């Protein structure tokens, strides 16, 4: 049998308010703080901060 995966999927939502998001995996045991990345938002055509939200 395969091992159970401990990673959880999180949704990184743009702070520009455009509704653009990226989905990433994160291990809650090793990464306890919330993720935030500076990634490209294709709606505003700029790099903006994306912050973590739970996937509903």
UniProtKB/Swiss-Prot annotation:
Any single biological process term in GO: translation
Superkingdom assignment: Bacteria
SUPFAM superfamilies hit by this protein: Zn-binding ribosomal proteins
Record-linked InterPro entries: Ribosomal_bL33 (IPR001705), Ribosomal_bL33_CS (IPR018264), Ribosomal_bL33_sf (IPR038584), Ribosomal_zn-bd (IPR011332)
Keywords: Ribonucleoprotein, Ribosomal protein
GO molecular function: structural constituent of ribosome
Keyword Ribonucleoprotein: yes
Annotated signal peptide: none
A single GO cellular-component term on record: large ribosomal subunit
Family membership noted in the UniProt record: Belongs to the bacterial ribosomal protein bL33 family.
UniProt protein name: Large ribosomal subunit protein bL33
Species the sequence originates in: Rickettsia typhi (strain ATCC VR-144 / Wilmington)
